[in-house]
Amino acid sequence: MVHKVHALKILKNISMNPIIEYESLLNTNKQFNDAYLQTFQSVLESGWYILGDKVKRFENEFANFVGSTHCIGVASGLDALMLALKVYDFPAGSEVIVPSNTYIATILSILHCNLKPVLVEPDLDTYNINPTLIEEKITSKTKAIMIVHLYGKPCNMDEIMEIAERYNLPVIEDCAQAHGAKFKGKQVGTFGTGAFSFYPTKNLGAIGDAGAITTSNDDLARKFRSLRNYGSEAKYQNDYIGYNSRLDEVQAAMLSVKLKFLNEITEHKRKLAAIYLSELNEDFICPAVSDVYFDVYHIFNIRHPKRDELKAYLLKHGIKTEIHYPIPPHKQKAMLGIISGIYPISEEIHNTTLSLPISYGHSEEDILRVIEVLNKF
C-alpha cells in the first residue's frame, strides 16, 4: 500500500507539468518532415539507391561545411573510425593512443583493426584527452593518435598536433559528437582525418545509421572511397581488402536537408547551454567555457557526487536525463583481458556525470523548468 501511495505522489507531481524528455526525435525533426517526405519520394523515383547523385551532393556540401577537400560517406561512425585506421595498413598489434573517457565505439574501431588501444586519461575540466599525458604513453609500437571531441567540445589541438608532428604520427579525430565544433576558429575534422557519425540523435542526425570521413589528402581520399566499396576503384576490380560501408542515397538526401539547418541547431543548443551556465547554482559542476573552444553542446553534462539520487529526483519531477556513460570502457565486460590499468579520472567522471535535456526540440522554458527543479535539490 505504501508503494502505491508513493507511486501516486510521483504521478501527481509529473501530471502538474508535462514530462520533459531527454530528447524526442519527433520534436527535433518535425520541422523537417515535409522536406523529408519529398526527398524520400525523389530518391524512390530516381531508381538509384547506393552511391548516386544524392551521396555526391552531400559529400560536397559536408566537405564545404567542415572546410576539408574531401568527404567520403560511409555506413556509420564506427565504420568511419575503422576505415580511418585501415587506410594505413598498420601491422597487427601496433598501438593507438586513445582517450580512456569515451564511448566504446572509439576503442572497438581499434580492436577491429587488430590494433592495441593505449588509454590516456582525460582532463577533468574538459573531459577530453589530456595532452600532457600522451607523450608518456608513446612507444616504438605507437602508430597513431585517436582523439575524441567529447560531448561537442573540441580537444586542445595545438598540443596534440605538436606531439603528433614530433613523433610523425597521424591523428584521427572522432568527431561523432562535434559537428561544427571549432578550436581557435578551425573546425574539427580538419586537423587530422575526421570521422563523423550521423546517428539520429547527433546534432546532424540522419534517420538511420550513417557516417563520413573528412580529409584534405587526395591519396587517402581515393583509398577511403575504394575501401568503403569492397576495395574497388573500378567495377569488378578489387585493389584492396575492402568492406561494404556505403552511405545510401536516402540517408545522404536526408542529411542534405538537415545540413542547411545545422548552424541554426547549433546556435539554439548554445543558447540553451548559456542559460544552464548562467542559472544553475554552484552545487553542480558545469562544462568549462573558454574562448578557444567553440562548443556545440551535443551533450550538456553536469557532475554531482549524488548523481544517482539527482537523476531519480529529476525523474520524480517529470524530467528525464541520461548518463554518458555509466560504465567506462576499461570496465566493460568485453574489455576483460584486453585493457589493463587504473583510470581514476575517467571513473570519477563516469560516477558523477549526468546529461541534461538540450536538444533542438527543447524550448528556453523547458530549460528554465529543469533549472528550477535542479536548484531545489
Locate predicted features.
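Helix C-cap/helix->beta junction micro-motif
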Residues: C113, R166-Y167, H317
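Active-site phosphate-binding strand-loop segment of PLP-dependent enzymes
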Residues: D125-A206, A212-T214, S355
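PLP-dependent aminotransferase class I/II
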Residues: H6-I14, L26, Q38, V55-N60, ...
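Phosphate-binding glycine-rich loop
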Residues: W48-E95, L108-C113, L119-E121, K186
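Conserved coil-to-alpha-helix start sites within the AMP-binding
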Residues: T102-I107
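Hydrophobic/aromatic ligand-binding patch that stacks against planar heteroaromatic rings
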Residues: L108-I110, I163, N203, V250
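A glycine-/small-polar-enriched, mobile loop at the entrance of the PLP active site in fold-type I
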Residues: E23-T28, L37-R57
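Short beta-strand->loop structural element characteristic of the AMP-binding/adenylate-forming
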Residues: K116-T126, E322
